[in-house]
Amino acid sequence: MERITVTLGERSYPITIAAGLFSDPTSFWPLKAGEQAMLVTNQTLAPLYLDTLCARLEGAGVIVDRVILPDGEQYKTLAVMDQVFSALLAKPHGRDTTLIALGGGVIGDLTGFAAASYQRGVRFIQVPTTLLSQVDSSVGGKTAVNHPLGKNMIGAFYQPAAVVVDLDCLDTLPARELSSGLAEVIKYGIILDGDFFSWLEKNLDALLALDGTAMSRCIRRCCELKAEVVAADEHEHGLRALLNLGHTYGHAIEAHMGYGNWLHGEAVAAGMVMAARTAERLGQFNPQDTDRIISLLQRAGLPVKGPESMTAEEYLPHMMRDKKVLAGEMRLVLPLEIGRAELRRGVAHDIVLASIRDCQ
C-alpha cells in the first residue's frame, strides 16, 4: 500500500494507492459507523462496483444512499448535478453527510462541485476508477461542470477529505480510456520530471499490459508530483498552471467537437504536440524532443494531430475563453525541455495558428 499526503495545513488529506481497497472500509477514512453518505456513480460503473462498495460500507456501520448518473462528458452539467442535490434533499442529508465520488473525471469533478455547493459545503471522498482520474483529476480540489461555451467554466476549488485509488478498477477500464489516462501521465514527465519521462519510454508496454508493479509506481509518481504542486500553489496562481500543458488547445477541441466525441486525454495529447510545435517556433524547444513526445504518445495509442474537420482558426475563440487568459491576453503552457515548462504570455496568434496547422 502506498500513501501520499497532500499537505494543505488543516485541510491536508491522504491519497491511498493499492489493490483491493474496496474490500477494506477503513480505506474510506474519515467515514465512521453511524455517519451518513451519498455515493455518486454512473450507469456504467454501477453494475461493476456499486453493490459491493455499498455492502462494505454498510457492514462498517455507514448509512449509504446512492445516486446513479448517466455516463459521459456531455452529462457534466448543472442540470445533471441537480440530480445529486435532489437525492440529497429527498432523504434528507445534512451538513454532516459525506459525498463519495465513484468514477472517473466527470463523476469526480461534478460530485466535488456538488459537495462544495450543498448547504455551503460538505465533506467528500474521491474514489477514482480511471487512470486519468487516479493520476490527475481526483487530486487537488478542482471541481467543475462544463458550459456549452467552455470546459470546466463553472466550478470551485474544494479539496476532498481523502482519495482512494483501488488499482483493481483498471482491470475493467476500456483500452481507449487507458490511453486517455496515459496522456496525463506523459504530461507530468514533460513538464516536471525528465527522468520519469525516460522511465515511461522504457516501461510503457508494461503499463499498457496493466502490470501491477509498473502501474503502482506510475500512479504513485504522478500523485507525488501533483501533491507537491498543489501544496505549493493550490489556487493556480503560478506553478500549478503548468499542469495545463496541452489543455488550452485540447479544451478547444473538446468544446468544438462536442463533449464526449474526443476523450479528454486524446484532446490533451494533440494539444501537447501543438504546444511543443509552438515552443519550437519560438526557438525554445528542441524538435528532437518533440519527436520523443510524439513517439511516446503514438505508442500509447493517442492522437498527435487535431481533428481533420477543425480549422486552425476555429481553435482561437475557444482558446480566448480559457481560464488562463488575463486582460484579454492568451497565456500558454509551453515546454522548455523534457522535464521543464513555462507559462508564456504574449505569443502572437499567427505563431499559434501556424503551430496548430503543423498538427493537422
Curated annotation (Swiss-Prot):
GO molecular function: 3-dehydroquinate synthase activity; metal ion binding; nucleotide binding
GO CC entries: cytoplasm
EC top class named in words: lyase
Keyword terms, alphabetized: Amino-acid biosynthesis, Aromatic amino acid biosynthesis, Cobalt, Cytoplasm, Lyase, Metal-binding, NAD, Nucleotide-binding, Zinc
Sites where the protein binds Zn(2+): E184, H247, H264
Catalysis performed (reactions): 7-phospho-2-dehydro-3-deoxy-D-arabino-heptonate = 3-dehydroquinate + phosphate
Family membership noted in the UniProt record: Belongs to the sugar phosphate cyclases superfamily. Dehydroquinate synthase family.
Descriptive protein name: 3-dehydroquinate synthase
Lineage: Bacteria, Pseudomonadati, Pseudomonadota, Gammaproteobacteria, Enterobacterales
The gene coding this protein: aroB
